[in-house]
Amino acid sequence: MTDPKSQNEGRHLEEGRTLILTGASRGIGHATVKRFSSAGWRVITCSRHAFPENCPWAAGPEDHIQVDLSDPADTARATSEMKARLKDGMLHALVNNAAISPKGTDGKRLGVLETETETWRHIFEVNLFSTIWLAQGLREALAKAHGAIVNVTSIAGSRVHPFAGAAYATSKAALAALTREMAADFGPLGVRVNAIAPGEINTAILSPGTEKMVEGIPLGRLGEPAEVAKAIYYLCTDQSSYVTGAELHINGGQHV
């Protein structure tokens, strides 16, 4: 049984730390906000949507930044705003969770032959390039705090997926490679960079037919957003102080 005293001491140690999270509007993003907030972190959320009036967590619009991550100019503008909001210019964690995965007009996955060039470009700008732009722009703040970066990839980045489109899957495979490159480049700055690769997670955007895929998952169930958030938290804290360049599979054994 967890000692309440040790829990309070742990929260005290975490207070004053700041996380910037992209893609916070639902699912894994929501769960991540809750996990870090419960540990005393300040969470600055970023999404293409304005701050919702019915926001499920306590933070207000002062901890939310609306940004179009497909637009390098707007991302640069948002990055400047992020830095202006940081206490003492320190950023303890950056989680790149935002991603898009467009479907065809019939709701089916877009393969290589069906995906237009503009769609490829848009997906890569959000899913891959924005990660680079944010990491470059926030480099000094992360280094000052000896912080951590977590990139959210996907099981679709390592195998053909029945629902995830070709451009989405390719962008996630590229993000896994980028994570290794970033770990090498950010390591000398004292910043760790890792990735998590979720499998089938029980969110509101599950594709029809996902229930059949559960039969092939060794643990026999979908993952929960809170389980993904716990892994992200681990990679952003001192619990993983000697872990960098890794991609953690969170899929109930689906990848084996």
Describe every region a protein language model picked out.
Residues S25-R26:
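Conserved glycine-rich cofactor-binding loop
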Residues T105-V112, E116-R121, M213:
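Substrate-binding pocket helix/loop in short-chain dehydrogenase/reductase
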Residues S154:
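Residue(s) in the substrate-gating loop at a strand-loop-helix junction
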